[in-house]
Swiss-Prot record:
This is 4-hydroxybenzoate octaprenyltransferase. It comes from Nitrosomonas eutropha (strain DSM 101675 / C91 / Nm57). It catalyses: all-trans-octaprenyl diphosphate + 4-hydroxybenzoate = 4-hydroxy-3-(all-trans-octaprenyl)benzoate + diphosphate. The gene is ubiA. HAMAP family: UbiA (MF_01635). The chain crosses the membrane at residues 20-40, 43-63, 83-103, 135-155, 160-180, 209-229, 234-254. Pathway: Cofactor biosynthesis; ubiquinone biosynthesis. Belongs to the UbiA prenyltransferase family. It is a multi-pass membrane protein. The lineage of its organism: Bacteria, Pseudomonadati, Pseudomonadota, Betaproteobacteria, Nitrosomonadales.
Length: 286
């Protein structure tokens, strides 16, 4: 392969060509960072967390493709991934994941000890998640914990502590991740049933759409409660109302369970995360 072809293969392995995963991981981290700093996060900490999010999401994708290397060739959406086609070897994927994880760890070394210690379970969750689809009926919940660890790390980095509020935000984000990743799982539902792996879309069964809606409502309800505790203003609650409207739009997209529409609904969650961050930002500025 030429250099450009290999670079393209590595970009696809780490999903740099599809940044939606990075954004969905970044938004709750930014929520936590802004709330922890009351709207004035340390610029160095902000840069470290943005870069760390990109590195760890990319590492997680490489690990995911390694874990699914025997499954992906049998799923229409994933059969052209670099590991599934043999363009990249399993050894290369592991080296990429290890290298990116090491870079992410080195990145946080200037931060306090608590943040560094929290990075250990965060890394273990990211590495182990792809394997939960073999035995755990709700792997999306496990992913929700993994995708939420940026929140306590943000509080630790900014304030030196992890207050109960941080864990409340973790709980909210957990339900959001279950909601949007179940939408994602609906895209591959037919293939996943044939292969025999486990997903929340399969576990919810005929209540899949209702389960997604319930998780979204729970997510927004917990954020509303967090806003009350923090005495947030109109911009925050206005953002939550807009997010609720976006959730209703998603419901109209997934109610017929058409794979293409479910995938669009999944992508739609980037707007939810962005709107909530905008509400937090404006609420602290105005």
């Amino acid at each position: 392969m030429t250099f450009s072809e290999r670079f393209s293969a590595y970009a696809r392995l780490t999903r740099l060509d599809k940044p939606i995963g990075i954004l969905l991981l970044l938004w709750p981290t930014l929520w936590g960072l802004w709330l922890a700093a009351d709207g004035m996060p340390d610029p160095m900490i902000l840069v470290i967390f943005v870069l760390g999010t990109i590195l760890m999401r990319s590492a997680g994708c490489a690990i995911n493709d390694f874990a699914d290397r025997k499954i992906d060739p049998h799923v229409s959406r994933t059969r052209n991934r670099p590991l599934a086609t043999g363009i990249i070897s399993s050894r290369e994927a592991l080296l990429v994941a290890a290298g990116l994880s090491l870079c992410a760890f080195l990145l946080i070394l200037p931060l306090n000890l608590l943040t560094i210690l929290l990075s250990v379970p965060a890394l273990l969750l990211a590495i182990s998640y792809p394997f939960t689809k073999r035995f755990f009926a709700m792997p999306q919940a496990y992913l929700g914990i993994a995708f939420s660890f940026g929140i306590p790390m943000a509080f630790a980095a900014q304030t030196g502590t992890v207050p109960p509020l941080a864990w409340l935000l973790v709980l909210a984000n957990l339900f959001w991740v279950i909601a949007y990743d179940t939408e994602y799982a609906l895209v591959d539902l037919a293939d996943d049933l044939k292969i025999g792996i486990k997903t929340s879309a399969i576990t919810f069964g005929r209540f899949d759409v209702a389960g997604i809606l319930l998780c979204h409502i729970t997510f927004l309800s917990i954020l509303t409660y967090a806003g009350i505790l923090l005495q947030r203003g109109i911009w925050f609650y206005g953002a939550l109302l807009v997010a609720l409207g976006l959730v209703i739009v998603q419901y109209t997209m997934i109610r017929n369970r058409e794979p293409a529409r479910c995938f669009q609904a999944f992508l739609h969650n980037n707007r939810v995360g962005a709107v909530i961050f905008a509400g937090i930002l404006l609420d602290t500025l105005i």
